[in-house]
């Protein structure tokens, strides 16, 4: 209501609801709101849209990692007897290769990703009980093959201090009178610092918010509504000469 905003709201199922609320407030107050800006949702969303538009007959796949899942790490930390933890989401390489082959496999959650947990337990804690709570936790670990390692606090700080992440968005499709030609569109990210990369995306979209507001636009927008030129620091002439 008071400012132009750019956010990284990332609960996919609630984005339509969030959009409606921000759109109403922004239009009533004469501001711009750019929501769900980051890499997923965000950069991955854009690549899904482009790939679906180009290959309407096809199949989408998203793989996350290898990287630290902050939400899953927090879920482990809430278990009694856990002092600290890091959880890595890891794509299953054989699943990735099957998708890249263009065979359009049907993959379950368990077949696409594994989860690896590094846990620092409180002194005297029941390690078996902690491990059982982790691997059976609904919505987080129960649907995955999950490995739990108990390590020292020193090892955690030495080997798992960063917040890397990344992933792959892949669409496979066919063209031709008899669907005889297969195509694979793949976009990938490998990030040493998830927060730093996400903030870089937010900064680019802040430029767009500024430009849109200068044009007199109001209301809520997503990455789907923003032309690429609005993100760049350079003007259109530079982009056409050097990047087109």
Please place each PLM-identified region on the residue numbering:
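Rossmann-fold NAD(P)-binding glycine/threonine-rich loop
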Residues: 9-33
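C-terminal substrate-binding/catalytic lobe of Rossmann-fold NAD(P)-dependent oxidoreductases
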Residues: 69-206
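Short alpha-helices
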Residues: 27-52, 202
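Short beta-strand and adjoining strand-loop segment in the mid-core
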Residues: 52-54, 59-63, 116-121
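Rossmann-fold NAD(P) dinucleotide-binding segment
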Residues: 1-8
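Gly/Ser/Thr-rich loops at beta-strand to alpha-helix junctions
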Residues: 11-16, 36-45, 66-70, 123, ...
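Oxidoreductase and adenylate-handling cofactor-binding alpha/beta cores
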Residues: 20, 43-59, 74-84, 208
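NAD(P)-dependent Rossmann-like dehydrogenase/reductase catalytic/cofactor-binding core
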Residues: 183-244
